[in-house]
Amino acid sequence: MVVKSILKYPDESTMDDSAAQAVQGDHPMNGLPVTIGEVKDSKQLYQFIHLPAAIHKDHFNWVPPIYMDEKEFFNPSKNKCFQACDTILLLAYKGKEVVGRIMGIIHHQYNTDHKEKKGRFAFFETWNDPQVAKALLDAIEDWARGHGMERVIGPLAFSDKDPQGLLIEGFDEPAVIASNCNFPYQVDLLEKDGYSKEMDLVVYQIKIPNPIPEFYLKIQERAIRLNAGLQVLEFTSRRKVKPYIHPVLHLLNRTFTEIFGFVPFSEAEMDDFANRYLFLINPRFIKIVVNGQNEVLAFVIGMGHIGEGIQKTKGKLFPFGIFHILRSAKKSKQLNLLLGAIDPDYRGKGLDVMMGVKMLESAIAQGKMTLDSHLELEYNTKVRSEMEKLGGEVYKRFRIFGKNLKE
């Protein structure tokens, strides 16, 4: 979709003193007017993808994306999510220099299923410059309004499987894969433009107990007795994981229907997801519960922290980046949970403990000392209770913002 005109925002010299002072930011080109243009060619897409590296060049905890993945993500012929949505990529300019970016998304199927008229923004990046931020947000709001939307929320991309929300607590902690890393000023920029809380997501950090507490082992033993005929599959080879990829993600589709922002995987997206992550995951951190017919009833997937490896390679896999990333995952003392689900008919029967003990055993064997829960919805009290039983504490909080659109 196309923005019909390039928006131009006034020079600070045309503002009163208080307004001019409000747009003072950290970028040296403050004072120039802002123009907004749509990404239409490969050069502009390159600028869109690589702008965050300039903004975050002195940001110690920021982890670049894996650029090979990023190029495929923004390629409509490779990323099937584009087929279900209206999208737009915008760049902000001061003079000829790119100073900001944002993506707009309208997910028609999600809106229909949830009876909503909400547009989304994602991949919002600027220096600390309210003038640029307002120009980008205004452009997305106008675009969404033009498509009949009544509200804009974000950061939220195609689904909850993509990085979502802005960090509002835990700025001193390192970023993990598939999560956003932002400066505090980005939160201020949104709030000053009228955005407020839509939804919070929390992340727990758990100290991995060694040895595993006796009470947890007793619960595991009881669960095994009560679930005769079920077994926890463990893996040492990615090749042996592959036959379970589609069954695992089909289970996710069935169990995540009420999760905020979740969009079911299509068959093609299942393959894309596997290609994107499987080579990075130590198969020892994949646990799957099956019944006697080898049907998947539950699963959990973890990954060694790879942030330092990606930082070292600057987001490049080749020629040697992949080795640094895999070494980082092995050497890291932190295990990051990625996904997990239990068939609704088997909830409350101890399958979580059966998998959990096996995961803790693998984590201890691999030298892990802490566990990151990944993002959990603040109202998901059941999962949060389980994390807290293990001594977990919230150490990061992310917020998805929203704003009503006026006619």
What are these regions (language model features)?
Residues 111-194, 199, 313-390:
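Acyl-donor binding region in acyl/amide transferases
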Residues 290-291, 300-306, 338-344, 355, ...:
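Active-site proximal loops enriched in glycine and acidic residues that flank catalytic Cys/His/Asp
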Residues 2-27, 133-236, 399-405:
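Acyl-donor-binding surface of acyltransferase catalytic domains
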Residues 35-47, 232-247:
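A short beta-loop-alpha structural element at the N-terminal edge
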Residues 2-10, 15-122:
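A generic N-terminal leader/anchor concept
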Residues 52-94, 102-112, 235-340:
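A conserved beta-strand-loop-helix scaffold within acyl/acetyltransferase catalytic domains
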